[in-house]
Amino acid sequence: MAHHATAGLPPPTPWQRLTRMLDTERSTIRYIIFYAVLTGLISLSLPLGTQAVFNLVSTGAVFSSTYILVAVVVGGVLLGGILLVGQMTLVEAIEQRIFAKAAIEYAYRLPRIKPEALEGEDPRELVNRFFDILTIQKGLTKLLVDVMFAVLQILMGVIVLSFYHPIFIGFGLFTILGLIGVYMLNYQRALRTSIEESAYKYELVAWLETVAGRLDEVRGDDKEEHKTLARADELTSEYLHARNAHFRILKSYYAYGIALRTILTAGLLIAGTLFVVSRQMTLGQFVAAEVLIVMISGSIEKLMTSINTIFDVLTAVEKVAVVTDLPMDEHKNSIAFDNA
C-alpha cells in the first residue's frame, strides 16, 4: 500500500493508487468477479425463462414442463441471492485487511518520516486522513458488488438482445459507447472538485482541533469565541461551495444517464414492436426483450447513482496517500529492517 515518490516520475493517478492498494487482493477479487459472472448468467434465467413460459402458455400447452421452467426461474433468483451473500463476505474480508494494513503502515511510517517533510505541517492533523480508509471500505462494497454486477448485466443483456435481431447490436454498441463517453466527459472535473471538497473538509476539521486544543483560552473570551465562529463559518462556506460545484457535475452525470436510458428504452421498444408486427420476432421474444430492457435500464441507473461513490473512493485513496507519500528517513528505515 505504500507509495514512494520517485524522483523524476509523476505521482500515480488515483486509479493507479487504488489498483496498487488492491493488488494483494487479486485472488479474492477473482472470486468476486467469478461470483458476479455467475450471478449475471443466472439473472438471464428470468427473461429467457419468461419467454419460454410465455410461449408455452400462449399456445395453451400448460404441461409439467411449464412448472419446471417456473421452478428454474425461481431457483435462479434464490441462487443469485446466495451468490450475492458470498460476494459480500469476500468484500468484507478485503475491507478488514485493507483497514489492518493501513493502520500498520501508518504506525510504521509516522516515526520514520523525514522531519523536513513535516515542516509547516501538524502531524496530528495529517493522521486524520486515515479516516478515509473507512470511505474506501464502504465504497468497495459498491464498486466490487453493485457496479461490477451492473456492468456485467449490461454486457450480458446487450449480448442476448443481439441474438433477437441484428439491429439490437447497434443499440448495444450505442449503450456501451454512451456510458464510456458520459463517464470520461466530466471525469477530470469531477475528480478535481471532489478532491477540493475533501481538502476544505480537512481544513475545517483542523481548525476545530485547534480550537479544542485551546479551550481554556477560548472559553469566556468573546473576541476568541467570535473568531472561532467566524473562521468556522468561512471554512464551512468554502466547503459548501466546493460541494455544490462537485454536485453540479454529479447532476450532469445523472442527466446524461436519464437521457441514455430514455433513448435506449424508447428505441428498443419501438424497434421490438415493429419486429413483432413484421413477424421478425415472436411475442415471447418481445416479452423477454422487454425484461432485458428493464434490467439494462436499471443497471444504467445503478451505475449513474454510484458515480458519487466512485469519486469518493478515488479521492479517499489520494487523501490516504498524503501520509504514505511522505519520504522516510532511510537511516531509520534500514535500522528497522536490520533489527527485524
Regions found by a protein language model. Name each.
Residues R26-L46, N55-A100, E119, F171, ...:
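Transmembrane-helix motif of ABC transporter permease domains
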Residues I42-L46, F54, R129-F174, L260-L264, ...:
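Hydrophobic alpha-helical transmembrane segments of ABC transporter permease domains
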Residues R26-S27, P115-L118, N128-L140, L144, ...:
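An intracellular "coupling" helix at the cytosolic face of ABC transporter transmembrane type-1 domains
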Residues F130, E225, V322-A340:
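Primarily ABC-family ATPase nucleotide-binding module
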Residues M1-S45, T59, F63-I68, Q87, ...:
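Membrane-integrated ABC transporters
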Residues G80, T89-P111, P115, G172-D216, ...:
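Cytoplasmic coupling helices
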Residues L56-A71, G75, V160-F174, I249-V317:
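Helix-loop-helix
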Residues L44, L48, G81-V85, V158, ...:
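Membrane-embedded alpha-helical segments of multi-pass transporters/permeases
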